[in-house]
Amino acid sequence: MIEAKNVWKIYGKGEAKTIALKNINLKIEEGEFVMIMGPSGCGKSTLLNILALLDTPTKGEVYYKGRRTSSMSENERAIFRRKISGFIFQQFHLIKTLTALENVELPMMLDERDKSYRRKRAKKLLEMVGLGDRLNHYPHQLSGGQQQRVAIARALANNPKIIFADEPTGNLDSKSGMAVMSILKGLNEKGITIIMVTHEQELTKYASKIIKLRDGEIVEIINK
């Protein structure tokens, strides 16, 4: 489904040059639950962003279903990000002036869905993540765990095939974190591919594949 071949990411030049990723080679199959792990600064988020087409490699290629993503137009890349992918971040990135329902509707507005469809689907998704009684709450009226569940519902708005999650439990207490992981596992069991960055070893029980990074290099790939 997604493949990286000889991917490098280099920032700066000369003495200021920083190598964030070194010769990354990996393959992610449809339906896998992949965890990218390693210490802070090892290149986890950089790799996730490149696989998600939020960033481009300095050298090497990323393929989606056999096609070089470097050959995609900017419009095709935008469609990949908007329709094929869903994104969940550590900081939630909810819009403070919108309700939970409106935050989930937003990707569908960008996709020009009609209002009745948006409202019905957003309500259904929030009910699915256990927030049917929080539809009209604003982010500041929700706990961290509830905000992350809104973010998951938003990520699902356009029926993505892949969810990219960057430390989705990083700002949550253990109970809320486990609730989020349970939701992600359930989505994976329905066929959605999950690619997730984490440094929490105890979460590896949810993964079908673990990619371990150190200093920008893959040091181990574990298929469970």
From Swiss-Prot:
GO MF term list: ATP binding; ATP hydrolysis activity; transmembrane transporter activity
Pfam families referenced in this protein's UniProt entry, alphabetically: ABC_tran (PF00005)
Keyword NADP: no
Binding residue positions for ATP: 38-45
InterPro entries: AAA+_ATPase, ABC_transporter-like_ATP-bd, ABC_transporter-like_CS, ABC_transpr_LolD-like, MacB-like_ATP-bd, P-loop_NTPase
UniProt keyword terms in alphabetical order: ATP-binding, Nucleotide-binding, Transport
Family matches, as SMART domains: AAA
Similarity comment: Belongs to the ABC transporter superfamily.
Identification of the protein by name: Uncharacterized ABC transporter ATP-binding protein MJ1508
Organism: Methanocaldococcus jannaschii (strain ATCC 43067 / DSM 2661 / JAL-1 / JCM 10045 / NBRC 100440)
Lineage: Archaea, Methanobacteriati, Methanobacteriota, Methanomada group, Methanococci
